[in-house]
A protein has these predicted regions:
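Conserved structural motif at the start of ABC-family nucleotide-binding domains
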Residues: 2, 17-19
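The feature captures the beta-strand-to-loop junction immediately N-terminal to the Walker
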Residues: 33-35
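Helix-to-loop junction immediately C-terminal to a conserved catalytic motif
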Residues: 48
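Conserved ABC transporter NBD signature motif
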Residues: 55-66
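Conserved ABC ATPase "signature" region
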Residues: 111-128, 150
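Conserved ABC ATPase signature
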Residues: 132-136, 140
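ABC ATPase nucleotide-binding domains
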Residues: 230, 236-258
Length: 258
């Protein structure tokens, strides 16, 4: 699905990423974790082909991003970013409809409206679809933009790819789990998701694989139970922790400060 080799990036002579190799498979939910400044968001932007890097090409569905038709690519790939404008003079539904722009010229089709309503239901924003976007709280705006990204990929294309940079910021526990269940359902249909998260326990619960970063390098990339060990996590985060099994789902449960 996605292959990247020897990704390196520097800014003003400061190394941000160093020789990163990543392969993501069809139907996989990969979660990128690591301390602040590890390079998580930069790596995500690189993988999404939003930033220039060294000459090594990134392969998506056996083609480089440069070889893709730029009108076709948005039907296969979408990205949710951390920074979204706080001043958008549109209704909530109009903001979500922006995700359908690759599908129509000036007037949305009924299929576009249906896709928007479906994504809004998944992110629990239907109730304020006619409200001014600027009147929403931070968490509500976050869910609106998640709906916008999801509706972009609402189509019959096989093996789609979504990138999400800290999609759970400002969300309460209910909506954190609701969003991750939606993403998990997306990958269970043969699609792929690459997500940056800070909550290690949510990563352990939902991820098929975890990529742990520190200072621009990969520390470990494996199944959650292989990455989330006391030795690895305590060292990378420079903070003591205990790892036990979650009694409900048997995933690793990280308890910091112990």
């Amino acid at each position: 699905m996605l292959e990247a080799c020897k990704i390196s990036y520097s800014h003003k002579k400061v190394s941000i990423l160093e020789n990163i190799d990543v392969t993501v498979n069809y139907g996989e939910l990969l979660v990128i974790v690591g301390p602040n400044g590890a390079g998580k968001s930069t790596l995500l932007s690189m993988l999404a082909n939003e930033m220039k890097h060294n000459d090594e090409p990134i392969i998506f569905k056996k083609k480089t991003f440069e070889d893709w038709d730029q009108k076709e690519l948005p039907l296969h790939k979408a990205k949710f970013s951390q920074q979204n404008s706080s001043d958008i003079p549109l209704t909530v539904m109009d903001v979500v409809m922006m995700g359908r722009y690759p599908y129509f010229n000036s007037i949305p089709h009924q299929s576009d409206i249906d896709a928007v309503l479906k994504s809004m239901a998944e992110t629990d924003v239907v109730a304020f679809k006619d409200r001014d976007y600027n009147t929403l709280s931070g968490g509500e705006r976050q869910r609106v933009h998640l709906a916008r990204v999801l509706t972009q990929l609402e189509n019959d294309v096989a093996h789609k790819l979504v990138f999400m940079d800290e999609p759970l910021n400002n969300l309460d526990v209910l909506h954190q789990h609701r969003i991750l269940h939606t993403v998990k359902n997306f990958t269970e249909r043969g699609n792929t998701a690459v997500i940056v998260l800070h909550d290690l326990n949510l990563a352990a619960q939902f991820a098929d694989s975890v990529l742990l970063m520190q200072k621009g390098k990969i520390v470990n990339h494996d199944k959650p139970e292989k990455v989330f060990t006391k030795e690895i996590i305590s060292k990378v985060y420079n903070f003591p922790c205990t790892i036990c099994l979650n009694p409900v789902n048997q995933n690793p449960l990280i308890i910091f400060g112990t």
